Amino acid sequence: MSVLDDIVAGVRLDLAERESATSLADLRAALADVDPPRDPMPHFRAAGSSVIAEVKRRSPSKGDLATIPDPAELARSYAAGGAAAISVLTEQRRFGGSLADLRAVRAAVDTPILRKDFIVSSYQVVEARAAGADLVLLIVAALDDDDLRRLHDEARELGLTALVEVHDEPETERAVALGAELVGVNARNLKTLAIHDDTFGRLAPLVPDDRVKVAESGIFGPDDVARFVREGARAVLVGEALVKDGDPEGAVRRMTGVES
């Protein structure tokens, strides 16, 4: 079993518990009380680099990264630094995240929020919107074509922007065929956790220029951002480097607006 398969198996177990506690119908009813979703795309299409700043306590590859006792405070720092969006990990077994973190961040900032998780069910898409998310992550490697299209369509129906994540050429072709407007290229292989520095440069040319390309993993400072911008990135998703920085606001500011 690959790392990705193991994570998804755990996600499905946790999902079953939440489904037994709150019905999909009740979740949908809760949408009436949620503010309309925010559109992140104008930020991503602006000149220079945009930053998706992540609230991330730990990862399968690095273990514990940061305690983050107050995700709302961290999110306010990111927003003050000019983050175009804030990514909140909600997977608990491997990443130490929760929907409570997402709700806390939503209450603290007006910045668009990405629910970063392993989305495999319609329930999770509705759950994301009910918690106040504006974007959801869809990992191509975790979904077959039918599920990928269904979840992408359901996200759009709810006004959510889907960040469609790819790791290799076949996945990139699937994302392009899907019509994904926001394509994330992750340098980390989720099946092995290895990082390949050439992944973005190899895959970005396969994505049409009218789509927004997001570089993910292996980004630690403005020099990394500049390299990805030269290769076609409009945005970068950064987690570890920001949660470990004593000045997350300044770190986001230094990575924002970088041009080739």
Swiss-Prot record:
One Gene Ontology molecular-function label:
indole-3-glycerol-phosphate synthase activity
Q: Tell me yes or no: is Amino-acid biosynthesis among this UniProt entry's keywords.
A: yes
Q: Reaction catalysed by this chain?
A: 1-(2-carboxyphenylamino)-1-deoxy-D-ribulose 5-phosphate + H(+) = (1S,2R)-1-C-(indol-3-yl)glycerol 3-phosphate + CO2 + H2O
Assigned EC number: 4.1.1.48
The protein's UniProt keywords, in alphabetical order, are: Amino-acid biosynthesis, Aromatic amino acid biosynthesis, Decarboxylase, Lyase, Tryptophan biosynthesis
Question: What Gene Ontology terms for biological process does this UniProt record contain?
Answer: L-tryptophan biosynthetic process
Pathway per the UniProt entry: Amino-acid biosynthesis; L-tryptophan biosynthesis; L-tryptophan from chorismate: step 4/5
Fetch the CDD domains from UniProt.
IGPS
**So which domain of life are we looking at?**
Bacteria
Is Amino-acid biosynthesis a UniProt keyword of this protein?
yes
Spell out the NCBIfam families in the cross-references.
PRK00278.1-1, PRK00278.2-4
What family is it from? Belongs to the TrpC family.
Kindly provide the name given to this protein in its UniProt entry: Indole-3-glycerol phosphate synthase
